[in-house]
């Protein structure tokens, strides 16, 4: 009997390391890569749709002397192969993999700063995995994007329009897509010198990943989850007279859509379009310092 028990224990000793190795391997992200800089409390930076991690270059430089900065690059965006994002949904699986990354690296309630789709992803993590995150900064993103298309939108009513947009992106010729991205960046970035790089990131993005990620953002409504979020959340939003009529109501849009989130801090950044960190670098850096303290 003891001999048999010894053999079982020996076998178990072989199996356990294999199992642990498999678990560690499973925790390796397939939907993003990460570049880690600095030492200290952990801060995760998530870029927006079709953006490179380099959109956070100035922020990473600002923080890396005092914090350990985790720069996310979403698979399929800005030249990175699609990897695990090659098919199916993008945003929710991305959030789940970031949570797995936090757990596997034993990060202690990291702060997360996310822009646009990255901000939505950060909200998703805070609402569905509150144990994983310490605080969140959302940069120019709403809990339900599609209210910007129609304030009465629901996830169900917007789905056909979201599917149509997804299919349009997939069906465009390279020339039409490039022209469209150039026009789009004129409305998203106020600083002309910053636009060409953002356009280049978009053109290097896997269009299938972009289209499906856009569909995800358009059809996922987190407003009903806000009341349950206990994580401290700061929301920065762009505000500029060149936005036209939106300039006068953007504050109300953010206030009404985040009304259910306890203790949310809503902070306008004047003189910026959607890429706040590129248009108002000093103001954005100051907001990051306030957020971290």
Stretches with model-predicted labels:
Residues 1-44, 64-68, 89, 108, ...:
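Alpha/beta-hydrolase fold catalytic core
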Residues 35-83:
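Conserved HGGG/HGGXW glycine-rich cap/lid loop of the alpha/beta-hydrolase fold
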Residues 37, 70-113, 117, 127:
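Active-site loop/oxyanion-hole signature of alpha/beta-hydrolase fold enzymes
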Residues 119-130, 136:
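Short glycine-enriched nucleophile-adjacent loop
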Residues 134-171:
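Flexible "cap/lid" loop of the alpha/beta hydrolase fold
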Residues 147-148, 153, 168-225:
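Conserved alpha/beta-hydrolase catalytic His-Asp/Glu region
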Residues 232-272:
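Conserved loop-alpha-helix segment in the C-terminal half of the alpha/beta-hydrolase fold
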Residues 269-281, 285:
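Catalytic histidine-centered segment of alpha/beta-hydrolase-like enzymes
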């Amino acid at each position: 009997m003891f001999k048999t028990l010894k053999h079982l224990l020996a076998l178990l000793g072989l199996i356990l390391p294999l199992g642990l190795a498999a678990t560690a391997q499973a925790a390796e992200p397939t939907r993003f890569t990460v570049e880690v800089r600095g030492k200290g409390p952990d801060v995760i930076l998530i870029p927006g749709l079709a953006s490179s991690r380099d959109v956070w270059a100035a922020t990473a430089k600002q923080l890396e002397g005092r914090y350990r900065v985790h720069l996310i690059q979403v698979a399929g965006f800005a030249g990175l192969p699609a990897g695990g994002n090659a098919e199916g949904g993008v945003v929710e699986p991305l959030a789940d993999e970031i949570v797995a990354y936090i757990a596997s690296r034993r990060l202690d309630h990291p702060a997360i700063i996310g822009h646009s789709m990255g901000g939505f992803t950060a909200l998703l993590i805070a609402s569905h995995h509150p144990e994983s995150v310490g605080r969140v900064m959302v940069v120019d993103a709403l809990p339900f994007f599609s209210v910007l298309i129609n304030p009465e939108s629901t996830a169900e009513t917007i789905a056909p329009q979201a599917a149509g947009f997804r299919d349009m992106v997939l069906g465009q010729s390279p020339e039409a897509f490039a022209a469209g991205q150039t026009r789009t960046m004129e409305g998203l970035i106020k600083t002309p010198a910053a636009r060409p790089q953002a356009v280049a990131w978009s053109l290097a993005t896997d269009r299938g990943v972009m289209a499906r990620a856009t569909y995800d953002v358009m059809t996922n409504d987190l407003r009903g989850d806000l009341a349950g979020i206990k994580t401290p959340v700061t929301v920065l939003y762009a505000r500029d007279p060149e936005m036209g009529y939106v300039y006068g109501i953007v504050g109300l849009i953010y206030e009404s859509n985040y009304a259910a989130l306890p203790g949310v801090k809503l902070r306008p950044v004047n003189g910026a379009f959607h890429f706040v960190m590129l248009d108002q670098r000093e103001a954005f850096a100051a907001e990051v310092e306030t957020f971290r303290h």
